[in-house]
Amino acid sequence: MTDTAARPLAGRHALVTGATRGIGQATALALAEAGAHIIAVGRTSGALEELDDAIVKAGSTATLAPLDLKDGPGIDRLGGAIYERFGKLDIFIGNAGVLGPMTPLAQVEPKEWDDAIAVNLTANWRLVRSLDPLLRLSDAGRAVLVSSGAAYKARAFWGTYAVTKAGLELLGRTWAAEVANISALRVNLLNPGPTRTRMRAKAFPGEDPETLPTPEEVAASILEMCLPSFTATGTLYDFPTRQLKEFQPPA
C-alpha cells in the first residue's frame, strides 16, 4: 500500500471543534491517522494536551487552540492565525455542541437559550466567516457540520436543542449553495444518531451505552466525507441508515 493510500490526508490541515471528547476527539484522531495536521479547538487546555499526545502516537501533529466558542472575537481571529501559519485550511469539522435545557420552551431561561444558540449555531456561523476564505484556498476544501435527528422532530422538552440544529442545517445548506459553483469547497452535514457520548448519557441517563455505536464508528464516516474523492455537497449523511440524503422541501 502506498503512503498516499494509507494516509490520504497527508499534507492537509484539519480544524475540529469540540475536539477533546466524544465524536470530536474520535474524528480528530481519525483524521490524524489519515495524515492530516490537526488544529484542535476545545475549552480545556489539559484535555487538548492529552489529545495532542494521542495524535503524536497516531503519527501526526497538532496545533492546540484553547477557545470558548462563545468568544466571537476569538473565533474571528482564528482564521487570520491559521492563514499566517499555514496559508490555507483543507478541512473544517463543526462538531462542538451543547444539549441545553431539557425544559418546556415557556420555562427556558434566557441565558440558557442564548448559550445554546451561541455554541450550536452562532459559533458555526462565525467559523464560516473566519474559515471560508481559507477553505477556498484548498484544492479540495471539505466542511462537515455535525447535526442531529432532533432538527426534524418536534419533541416535547427538546425545543432549545432542536432549534439550534435546525438552524445549523440551513446554515450548512446555504453555505454549500453559495460556494458550489465558485470553488472546490464542499459542505455537508452529518446526523450521527444515537451515539455513545456524554451528551447522549445526559439526555438518556437510563440507556445502556453498550447498545450504541461508538464515536469512532461515526468518525470513520466523517473521515470519508473529508477525502478529496468525496465530491457531494449540500447533502446530509445519515449515519444510522448509512445513507447520503438530498434535502427534499415540502411540495
Describe each model-derived feature in a short phrase.
Residues T103-L105, E112-I117:
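Substrate-binding pocket helix/loop in short-chain dehydrogenase/reductase
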Residues L185, L189-L190, T197, P205-A251:
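C-terminal helical subdomain
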